[in-house]
Amino acid sequence: MTSKPLEHVADIEKSLRHIAAIIKQKGREILNQYAITPPQFVGLQWLYELGDMTIGELSGKMYLACSTTTDLIDRMQKNELVERVKDPADRRVVRIHLLPEGERIIQEVITKRQEYLRDMFESFTDEEIAIFEKSLMKLQHEMKRK
């Protein structure tokens, strides 16, 4: 594969950065309707997608120190969004479990974020959306691979 012209890569990087910032801002506006912080949302999102996790596993996914994640979980447990449960296979292991209220909030927030994106795609044809989705998935795959 030949090297892509740097100006195209620079334009794509700039567009992705701007899109990410807009989505992040819109996501925060949506989160302001709920009693959770952006880091709590990220933690809830990982638990929703992957199921019960240890503090260490969640810390790794969130790129946070275990002590920071512990404080985050303490606050979410106090608000009855998550609970700590002993692993039945190894009682020394404690897993973080998403409670119904945490699941409700994460589902509502994700739905509102998806509705926002759907509105942004109103002027796109079905073919453009399919190509865009395929390209994003390919980029994500390459980024995970390297």
UniProtKB/Swiss-Prot annotation:
The HTH marR-type domain sits at 9-141
Keyword annotations from UniProtKB, A to Z: DNA-binding, Transcription, Transcription regulation
> Looking at the Swiss-Prot or TrEMBL record, what is one Pfam family this protein matches?
MarR
Could you tell me which PANTHER family the record lists for this protein?
TRANSCRIPTIONAL REGULATOR, MARR (PTHR42756), TRANSCRIPTIONAL REPRESSOR OF EMRAB OPERON (PTHR42756:SF1)
Q: Which GO terms describe its biological process?
A: regulation of DNA-templated transcription; response to stress
**SUPFAM superfamilies per record:** Winged helix' DNA-binding domain
**Which organism is this protein's natural source?**
Bacillus subtilis (strain 168)
What GO MF annotations does this protein's record show? DNA binding; DNA-binding transcription factor activity
Name the record gives this protein: Uncharacterized HTH-type transcriptional regulator YsmB
- Answer yes or no on keyword Protein biosynthesis: no
Gene that encodes the chain:
ysmB
The residues that make up the annotated DNA-binding region are 55-78
